[in-house]
């Protein structure tokens, strides 16, 4: 029964990550799986589940704080292109995304559709 709860938790983490950030579901899933695995191992070894939960919550707060401190605003077209290129693994896609964002502005919407036509 615990494995099913863990699987549901991991699934929910991936969904929430996708809803909030639109990216990072693989990282979130790997972290959630590790937390569930190690959490179950610690509880089986006699750890107090509530203490474990509080420890995880404190760790999440600290990690969030650290990430927010190191976060950088992405403002220029060049920064957008560089960030998008890293995410896509392709500089030309990064440039294309930066160009699209430059045209629609910060509040604009960009829709990406899959095409069956190669090269278009």
Curated annotation (Swiss-Prot):
ATP binds at residues 23-27. Keywords: ATP-binding, Chaperone, Cytoplasm, Isomerase, Nucleotide-binding, Stress response. GO terms for cellular component: cytoplasm. It is found in: Cytoplasm. Its main location: cytoplasm. One of its GO terms (biological process) is protein refolding. It catalyses: ATP + H2O + a folded polypeptide = ADP + phosphate + an unfolded polypeptide. SUPFAM superfamilies: GroEL equatorial domain-like. GO terms for molecular function: ATP binding; ATP-dependent protein folding chaperone; isomerase activity. InterPro entries: Cpn60/GroEL, Cpn60/GroEL/TCP-1, GROEL-like_equatorial_sf, TCP-1-like_intermed_sf. Forms a cylinder of 14 subunits composed of two heptameric rings stacked back-to-back. Interacts with the co-chaperonin GroES. Belongs to the chaperonin (HSP60) family. Together with its co-chaperonin GroES, plays an essential role in assisting protein folding. The GroEL-GroES system forms a nano-cage that allows encapsulation of the non-native substrate proteins and provides a physical environment optimized to promote and accelerate protein folding. PANTHER family: 60 KDA HEAT SHOCK PROTEIN, MITOCHONDRIAL (PTHR45633). This is Chaperonin GroEL. It comes from Mycobacterium malmoense.
């Amino acid at each position: 029964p615990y494995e099913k709860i863990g699987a549901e938790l991991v699934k929910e983490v991936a969904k929430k990550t996708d809803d909030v950030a639109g990216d990072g579901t693989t990282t979130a899933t790997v972290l959630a799986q590790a937390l569930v695995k190690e959490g179950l191992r610690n509880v089986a070894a006699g750890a107090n589940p509530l203490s474990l939960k509080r420890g995880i919550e404190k760790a999440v707060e600290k990690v969030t704080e650290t990430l927010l401190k190191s976060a950088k605003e992405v403002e220029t077209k060049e920064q957008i292109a560089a960030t998008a290129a890293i995410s896509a693994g392709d500089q030309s896609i990064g440039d294309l995304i930066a160009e699209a964002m430059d045209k629609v502005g910060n509040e604009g919407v960009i829709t990406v559709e899959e095409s069956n036509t190669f090269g278009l």
